[in-house]
C-alpha cells in the first residue's frame, strides 16, 4: 500500500510503500487483546499484602477453657473471625506476569499497526529533526498535522532536540523503534512513524 509522506510543517514530501504483511492485515482483536493483557500484567506491581494469622502480633493463649462456658470452641485470638485477627486467604506479594510466545507478540504488533492503518490513524513523516528545540514551535507543528493524541516512533535514536521539545506536551509519547509496542499504539489516537521507523519495521518483519 502507498501512503503520503509529510513534513513536520505539514507539507507534502512524496510517498512511501508500506508492506501489506505489516500494515495491510485484517486486524485480529483476539491477538491484540492477548498482547495488551500480557503487557499490563507484566507491568503490574503486585505489592498487595495483608497479614495472615501467623503474622499478627497477638497472644496465642487459648481464650477460655474448652468446655463448660457455653461458648463456641476458640483457640486463638489471631483467628480470622475475630476483630484484629489475621486475614484468611488474603493477597500476597507476587508477580502477575505470564508467558506469551514471541511469535504471538510479533504478530499482535503487526495487527496493531494494520488496525491503525485501516482506521486512518497512521501518519508517516520524513524526519523529526528540529532547527530549535522549542516546545511552543513543536506544538504549532502538531497543530498543523492535527495531532492531539499521538505516539511518535523514530529510528534507533530519537532526535535529542525533538525529544526535549516534546516531553512536556500532554498525550504525546515519543519512542525509538526498539520501544514500539501494542499497548502504546492503541492508547493514542494517531501513530506517527518516521521514514527511518518504517524502514526498521520493514527490516524487522521481512
Swiss-Prot record:
Keywords, alphabetical: Ribonucleoprotein, Ribosomal protein, RNA-binding, rRNA-binding
Keyword RNA-binding: yes
GO BP: translation
Pfam families: Ribosomal_L4
One of the record's GO molecular function terms: rRNA binding
GO CC term, one of those recorded: ribonucleoprotein complex
Family affiliation: Belongs to the universal ribosomal protein uL4 family.
PANTHER family: 50S RIBOSOMAL PROTEIN L4 (PTHR10746), LARGE RIBOSOMAL SUBUNIT PROTEIN UL4M (PTHR10746:SF6)
Subunit relationships: Part of the 50S ribosomal subunit.
Biological role stated in the UniProt entry: One of the primary rRNA binding proteins, this protein initially binds near the 5'-end of the 23S rRNA. It is important during the early stages of 50S assembly. It makes multiple contacts with different domains of the 23S rRNA in the assembled 50S subunit and ribosome.
Protein name in UniProt: Large ribosomal subunit protein uL4
Organism whose genome encodes this protein: Nitrobacter winogradskyi (strain ATCC 25391 / DSM 10237 / CIP 104748 / NCIMB 11846 / Nb-255)
Lineage of source species: Bacteria, Pseudomonadati, Pseudomonadota, Alphaproteobacteria, Hyphomicrobiales
Gene that specifies this protein: rplD
